[in-house]
Amino acid sequence: MAQALLVPPGPESFRLFTRESLAAIEKRAAEEKAKKPKKEQDIDDENKPKPNSDLEAGKNLPFIYGDIPPEMVSEPLEDLDPYYVSKKTFVVLNKGKAIFRFSATSALYILTPLNPVRKIAIKILVHSLFSMLIMCTILTNCVFMTLSNPPDWTKNVEYTFTGIYTFESLIKILARGFCLEDFTFLRDPWNWLDFSVIVMAYVTEFVDLGNVSALRTFRVLRALKTISVIPGLKTIVGALIQSVKKLSDVMILTVFCLSVFALIGLQLFMGNLRNKCSQWPPSDSAFETNTTSYFNGTMDSNGTFVNVTMSTFNWKDYIADDSHFYVLDGQKDPLLCGNGSDAGQCPEGYICVKAGRNPNYGYTSFDTFSWAFLSLFRLMTQDYWENLYQLTLRAAGKTYMIFFVLVIFLGSFYLVNLILAVVAMAYEEQNQATLEEAEQKEAEFQQMLEQLKKQQEEAQAVAAASAASRDFSGIGGLGELLESSSEASKLSSKSAKEWRNRRKKRRQREHLEGNHRADGDRFPKSESEDSVKRRSFLLSLDGNPLTGDKKLCSPHQSLLSIRGSLFSPRRNSKTSIFSFRGRAKDVGSENDFADDEHSTFEDSESRRDSLFVPHRPGERRNSNGTTTETEVRKRRLSSYQISMEMLEDSSGRQRSMSIASILTNTMEELEESRQKCPPCWYRFANVFLIWDCCDAWLKVKHLVNLIVMDPFVDLAITICIVLNTLFMAMEHYPMTQQFSSVLTVGNLVFTGIFTAEMVLKIIAMDPYYYFQEGWNIFDGIIVSLSLMELGLANVEGLSVLRSFRLLRVFKLAKSWPTLNMLIKIIGNSVGALGNLTLVLAIIVFIFAVVGMQLFGKSYKECVCKINVDCKLPRWHMNDFFHSFLIVFRVLCGEWIETMWDCMEVAGQTMCLIVFMLVMVIGNLVVLNLFLALLLSSFSSDNLAATDDDNEMNNLQIAVGRMQKGIDFVKNKIRECFRKAFFRKPKVIEIQEGNKIDSCMSNNTGIEISKELNYLKDGNGTTSGVGTGSSVEKYVIDENDYMSFINNPSLTVTVPIAVGESDFENLNTEEFSSESELEESKEKLNATSSSEGSTVDVAPPREGEQAEIEPEEDLKPEACFTEGCIKKFPFCQVSTEEGKGKIWWNLRKTCYSIVEHNWFETFIVFMILLSSGALAFEDIYIEQRKTIKTMLEYADKVFTYIFILEMLLKWVAYGFQTYFTNAWCWLDFLIVDVSLVSLVANALGYSELGAIKSLRTLRALRPLRALSRFEGMRVVVNALVGAIPSIMNVLLVCLIFWLIFSIMGVNLFAGKFYHCVNTTTGNMFEIKEVNNFSDCQALGKQARWKNVKVNFDNVGAGYLALLQVATFKGWMDIMYAAVDSRDVKLQPIYEENLYMYLYFVIFIIFGSFFTLNLFIGVIIDNFNQQKKKFGGQDIFMTEEQKKYYNAMKKLGSKKPQKPIPRPANKFQGMVFDFVTRQVFDISIMILICLNMVTMMVETDDQSKYMTLVLSRINLVFIVLFTGEFLLKLISLRYYYFTIGWNIFDFVVVILSIVGMFLAELIEKYFVSPTLFRVIRLARIGRILRLIKGAKGIRTLLFALMMSLPALFNIGLLLFLVMFIYAIFGMSNFAYVKKEAGIDDMFNFETFGNSMICLFQITTSAGWDGLLAPILNSAPPDCDPDAIHPGSSVKGDCGNPSVGIFFFVSYIIISFLVVVNMYIAVILENFSVATEESAEPLSEDDFEMFYEVWEKFDPDATQFIEFCKLSDFAAALDPPLLIAKPNKVQLIAMDLPMVSGDRIHCLDILFAFTKRVLGESGEMDALRIQMEDRFMASNPSKVSYEPITTTLKRKQEEVSAAIIQRNYRCYLLKQRLKNISSKYDKETIKGRIDLPIKGDMVIDKLNGNSTPEKTDGSSSTTSPPSYDSVTKPDKEKFEKDKPEKEIKGKEVRENQK
């Protein structure tokens, strides 16, 4: 392809399309057709040439073609792509160089390509204004569509739109043709959309179709046209469609699982949700007198009782009457109840009956399969599921919580996250593909360049030489170049040669200058002229300096790394104009919000041995940050511009020669069009924005620069930012006048400080350079806004400006790497998400308009159905804004409530369709793409902002200086003391000194290495400053040497960096000897160039291992630390004699006790018992005296046992070991708590508040179990490893949220108060109460009350935001915000409507981004941890992994004995029938049919229906029993050796029992129909038989793989729930029952607490549980409420404890555990997909062994050689070797044992090798494999190969040759001896036979002479294989002769 592309670039490649061209094409096409033989005309697509991707229609013309001659713009040209040479196409290029491809056939049969009409149409079509016009029309049209009640004149506008669209389509049809050929109008799917829209428009206009609004909604599709017009969107939509295709498997699995769960739900809860509490009929009614007869069943046909007195009572009518149901306040639906003991009970005077409709308008139910499915889908998406959960538990009983646990964990967490995993994978694949494409292009361009170079080498050598000398004769040349850059940019044949010569000269000049350069400016040189040229060329091709891939160049030679100081003495930042780095390296190199002071362009590799140089007084420094790519691009290009101007400027001239040399590299390749601004702007900038007027000014400037750029000033400014943030966060309501004036003054002061900083920086740097940098622009904007705000302080309505001050918080990112990284990730994602966000916006827009058009009217007309007052509810679709809000709410995952409303007013089907579409398309796909992008930007940024950490920022420098100062003072004081008191020689210690070790100076710079100073980096962790963590580099003259010595701010490398900082934190016991110290030093040194990541903890240290694995030699360690012993020498006791020895023996005894397994088991048992005991302390404990007493004693016993354990461990391990182990500390603290409460009880202080709260800490006891259970410990360790980064992200999120919280306080503080009626609890109308004073006037009956969760201060704001971010309780907050007016004013309904947008913005940034970041961090961390502790995986190549996995699977299997076929003829027939695959599949079909019949069941089906279904069920039971009997007959007792059969057997027995004892079972157990549901599990078996189900198998495989890990996480979650349940019971058992707390869901007992906590695990309904706890004083609660049976008084909660309890639980469970779950699933999913993508899967090996069983019925593991061919042919692909396969099998060289048998492993190994191909690693693996196989199958020990198939064949062939020759010899002998009397003819006849034999043997010989066979063997089996069998070969080389003789005759006979 590359070859074909090499049309000479420039105008020559463009040729106008003429009649001749058309004729030529036709001729070529005819020739090609003639050339091809018939057969080859349909060759496979693989080998067909493909169109060039760079010349596709819609792309821009590659740069290599140069400019289009003006006369050829918008004209038909011959196709540039060689692929289309013989196809009838032509191209047209517009001014923007976009390619349009057309068919060269006649359009509409009349317009030839050269027809003037068609030419005009083409000109219009390709013109950019045309697409602009269409774009504007679409947007305007969209605006008109959002009008809910359009005025009449819009009708005419509609016609205009239709007209424009029609015109567009006509133009397209005229230009392209309609539909027959390629590239015609209807060949583009996007045009189908246009076409249908236009047709619909005309149809609706002229034909009356009744429901017009439904059809008018089709106009909405016009919005989709934007996608086809905006270029980037098509690709995103492509990606979306791809991910939806990938989702098909997950979707099927999801639907299947949901169906199964829905069936279970249907069987368990059918009709339950209609159980209501109905009033017991009044005593005087006829009912009372007849109750007995009713219950005895005497009732006439219509449900009426007839009795003696003849008064009638209709029971059905009575219970159908809504007014008799018990309804709680504020609820729409009556209270549900159940008749089970653990179900909800009715109040006094009420009875539980099944009547009325289901809850929520009748839409929440399990009565039919479809409603059950909807309920399950809702559970899976976790929308308002707490409501379903509570209703079901209330109606059916608490035990059914198990059902919900299963559905939530398997359905919700697993399936939803699988969808995420699939989308992320699809995204990743797409990314890979684009990267590969880019690489491929690069290679092609390289090739082109090579070609160009060759073409142009010879032609113009002379001209070029003269040109070069002229060009570089002076600066003038540069100026000219600037002017003529458009010429220079063309890669015309002339310029290419010139480059080379110029470059050579320049090279030599550079070498000379480079050695004697005085100003210290270093230019990294690139290695070869070619590479420079190619790179620069590539750059200009893309116009994107970042496309260079990592391979392109090493960090050392970024093409043009030009120092800022070239341009002016003030700037010493290295800004490279073009830095070619790969994506990964680019991150954080120089950046947007960052100053580019130490933005060195070398990477960490080159940092290591760099020179350290101080910076000059005149240069500015600052901290480093990071840039987005576009920014870098802009800045680079702009700096290129500047450089040119600067050169023209006088100050730059003296250096010009050296610069010129480098600049010209890129000069010719940069087009003028790429300049950011016109040249006049730079001239203006030079004069007005760079202030260099006089010397005095320069001095002032210099001074200001010194001050402003000092790190201490930076530190001060950072402190000011923090203080300012604090001041802003201190606003609250109500605030005193004094406090508020303090805040105002503070604000003024800070504004002043920041303004001064900005002004000084501008003076120091000049405006021109000041605004070159992201951070400074940011500062400038904020300062200007603050000043504006001061000016406009008193203007009403501009308080919004105050919110901009909050952005100052972001300045912290300068010195806080994690925040910086986060902003960067969000920045990157927003860049990548730009298109996605547009697509999302289009989707939201379309659905909002559709909703408005379809349902708007219905909401208006049927509003009384959903609202008693007949007012529109808050969520409706009557206008565009509200419609948009509903769609947005659905995207947040809350769809069910709004859908109920919609279904009630507008009918079920349409609403279901629309809402499901929004839910599936919007929510699942788009939000998951969000996540996928976030995750991918994580992996590319590698979370740890490595580059940032490696650069020191000013803050660290300042802190470092302070640290040094303090150290200096400390050392001085120490020395004084030493001199005064100790006259000893100094011992050299490892310490942080400040001595300079070495100081080498030469003519270029100095390298200084200092001892390390410890700095706290941004995370508060100590990190050594040095190789690993931070390095800066400067280049200096030697005269700067002194300034260096005097400048203490420099940091320098030390050989061990991170290592030393680790020493600081090590425990002393870790190093028992010097050598160990040395070793660890080396170790640490090896890791010292750690990534500097926030996560990267030191490598696991010896101490940790010591803690986990007890010493082998059973010797206790020292009791005390060395420090203690030094200070108190008496602690050291001699263990050799006397008391010391007794003490030592005692310790040894204790040690052996503690280390004993039984001791540990006993302690675990005690821990479990004591934890269990806590669960009994509920509110009923007072009434159960015996239990209470028992528990008190037990508590004491447990406490004593634990104290004893602790003492034993102290004696055994010594204090040092005990107290350096974190788990021991945990034990210690928990024991202390028990001890304190014991002592307090003994002393009678048990009622003290402090003691009571201490007792609640006993809830932590179960934590001790953590260290004892391996599984949980693994998870905890992983979590602890993740804590630093989770904390980091949590902090960043808090900062992020702080901004929204402060903004919320500014907007809503004090405005949520409202006046309520104390009797009814309703809010007063605005007519009655307008403000606070009106409310006061009403006295007792009114109350001025605040919403519980509000924005009155920043803390409350945080809680409110957490509720919004988790979408729980957010409605109330939003309603309050939307209704609010001002402080002390009564709210009005939707007064402040657009406040919704505050929440929308917060949800997007605060919730989607930040909460997903947690997932990102955890997954990222997970991977990092795996890498750190991971096993071989990381050190294996991909190849090796493939083999390893195949082998792993291989080794674990072994052939089994098949079930023998019965000898009895009848049994044998049945056996054959049962073992066929068809039988299996038919049974599966029966199971599915059974499932369908179960789905048909409904709650209120007719008796006849019930009868039919039970008969059908009977049939199924008979069939399944039949299957069972058949299998039993044929398989005999072997039936029970297969797990699945036992399962079938149990199900069949249960079904039969269930059929006969249905009533009995239903009464005491569950509904017997459930047994039939269980049978569905068998469907799992069928998946193996279906080839197409591979995807689903993968998903299930992923689940199986994740189960162990998920079980561990589940255990941990249970532990957390347990602790919180105990804690909740002791704190919230008695709170007032309201909101989410009622008689069933509360913290009164352990069970109830667990039920509540399980619900909050998914963060569902936590607002409801928190609300009652926030009641802290009357009138919200009653502090003196009496609780019968208990001594506790009052039902008030404790808000601070409550908030802490719920927030911490949500963070732990929801963010951590649930996200760990996600991480595990994503991980295993990718592993599983890799597995399934491997050439050999688990199933292939299983299949191999299944076939093997038939050939080896006795499971000997051997097969005879003669059967091998049939065996190979019986396998399935990929292992299959079809017949004829003899030769192949022989060539495999398989080892054989006596009896010509071959072992299964050898065959499998050879076949596997055949599939996987050659590899050198096979030997080692093979040996490994055999070991494993031996271990699992001891029978193979006897296996000693004697020969191999190949050897056997060679033996056979050689035997044949020997025999033949021997026969010939015998014959000759005979001929000699035989007398001549025999006739010659007979002799002829005799000889004939051998001759025939010869021929046969010759043939064989030809096929397999030794050489040939060897050749073929080497192709099918690698030499490595031989090496394994070589020893064997030698072994049986000896036996060969005898064997041959033995075997000869036998074989001959066989032949």
UniProtKB/Swiss-Prot annotation:
It catalyses: Na(+)(in) = Na(+)(out). Pfam families: Ion_trans, IQ_SCN5A_C, Na_trans_assoc, Na_trans_cytopl. Residues 46-57, 510-529, 596-622, 1925-1951 have a biased composition (Basic and acidic residues). Residues 1-128, 175-188, 236-249, 425-712, 764-773, 817-834, 935-1156, 1212-1217, 1272-1284, 1420-1477, 1529-1538, 1592-1604, 1722-1951 are cytoplasmic. Residues 1851-1880 form the IQ domain. The modification Phosphoserine is found at S484, S485, S486, S1452. CDD domains: Na_channel_gate (cd13433). III repeats lie at residues 1139-1450. InterPro entries: Ion_trans_dom, Na_channel_asu, Na_chnl_inactivation_gate, Na_trans_assoc_dom, Na_trans_cytopl, VGCC_Ca_Na, Volt_channel_dom_sf. Glycans are attached at N211, N290, N296, N302, N307, N339, N1317, N1331. It is found in: Cell membrane; Basal cell membrane. The chain crosses the membrane at residues 129-146, 153-174, 189-206, 214-235, 250-269, 398-424, 713-730, 739-763, 774-793, 798-816, 835-855, 908-934, 1157-1177, 1190-1211, 1218-1243, 1253-1271, 1285-1307, 1394-1419, 1478-1496, 1505-1528, 1539-1556, 1569-1591, 1605-1628, 1696-1721. Its main location: membrane. Keywords: Cell membrane, Disulfide bond, Glycoprotein, Ion channel, Ion transport, Membrane, Phosphoprotein, Repeat, Sodium, Sodium channel, Sodium transport, Transmembrane, Transmembrane helix, Transport, Ubl conjugation, Voltage-gated channel. Belongs to the sodium channel (TC 1.A.1.10) family. Nav1.3/SCN3A subfamily. The sequence contains 4 internal repeats, each with 5 hydrophobic segments (S1, S2, S3, S5, S6) and one positively charged segment (S4). Segments S4 are probably the voltage-sensors and are characterized by a series of positively charged amino acids at every third position. Pore-forming subunit of Nav1.3, a voltage-gated sodium (Nav) channel that directly mediates the depolarizing phase of action potentials in excitable membranes. Navs, also called VGSCs (voltage-gated sodium channels) or VDSCs (voltage-dependent sodium channels), operate by switching between closed and open conformations depending on the voltage difference across the membrane. In the open conformation they allow Na(+) ions to selectively pass through the pore, along their electrochemical gradient. This is Sodium channel protein type 3 subunit alpha. It comes from Rattus norvegicus.
